[in-house]
Amino acid sequence: MKKLVLVVDAPEESFSGERFVSLVAPSFPQVSFQITSRRDGSGPGYAEADAIFGYAHQFAEGMLSAAKSLKWIQSFTTGVDGILRLKSLRPEVFLTSMRGMHGPQMSEMTFLHMLALSRDYPRILDNQRNRNWERIPKPTMSGKTVVILGVGAIAAALARRCKAFDMEVIGVSSSPRPVPDFDRIMARSDLAAAAALADFLVVLVPLSPQTQGIIDAGILAAMKPSAYLINVARGGVCNENDIIAAVRDKRIAGAGLDVFSTTPLPADHPLWNTPGILLTPNLGGMSTTYLEQTVPISMQNLKCLVENRLGDLINVIPH
């Protein structure tokens, strides 16, 4: 009997379910793929689905309640807190993510923020608009210290690129261990001490009860006045009011934020007009090849489904 995999279409993410299925289905004749745009569980296929593929933010209580035969959820995202908070997520259902897939685009977005802030690119753009020829020397990245909170696959990709810029790379982890391309790893309990060393403090940890609000006034106070904070992880990891105060009072040099506690960021939020804060609207994980990037992990895990080896799925998220 064929396995049934339901793929939730995501046009708002420029993700075509039809295109995804066209790439993976030829390798899995044992699987029947069905595309749905319904996210309340009322559409066809939910009751019989062995697996559901979709973006974490698409999942809702009704969807999982209707999926009586569900054995596995494959998220097209790294963060899965949108799924984990659902009461209808049954403990026996496997949940997997796209952890590690976003290294190239997340690293590049981090560098965009680091370079734009350290070179004061907003001022350069203002000068261009005003036809003002102003030349101000700025520091190079070479020799600077980047402290990365989190040492997962995306952090490892960033570390490699930082070494290419001749930067010192320090990781902060809840389980310190040697990691390639990091000069050293410090314990999360020593985050304040690590922050004091940073020219750039980059946040790359998932949102969890342990990381909620971990970047607060205390950590920001430990940073050098010349240092920058970059958050490309989850908005809830940082206290936004504390960031605004630290930048406004020039206790840190600035901040680059791609993620926020509320998305979309409300038009009246003070982050929009705080000088020294650079905002990008959740662009870090996006790329024009995102759909294609999801295929290798999806295919490896689909092989486990058809061979009834769900215990061998990769990127399993405990819940």
Where on the chain are the PLM-derived regions?
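N-terminal glycine-/charge-rich "phosphate-binding" loop or analogous flexible N-terminal tail
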Residues: 1-51
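C-terminal helix-to-coil terminal segments
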Residues: 20, 96-109, 123, 263-319
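Short acidic low-complexity segments
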Residues: 36-46, 61-62, 183-197
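Phosphate/diphosphate ligand-binding glycine-rich loop within oxidoreductases
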Residues: 50-125
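Short, conserved loop/helix-junction motifs that constitute active-site signature segments
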Residues: 62-69, 86-91, 220-225, 246-250, ...
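Glycine-rich NAD(P)-binding loop of Rossmann-like domains
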Residues: 124-157, 184-185
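NAD(P)-binding Rossmann-fold cofactor-contacting core
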Residues: 164-181
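Rossmann-like adenosine-cofactor binding region
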Residues: 176-270
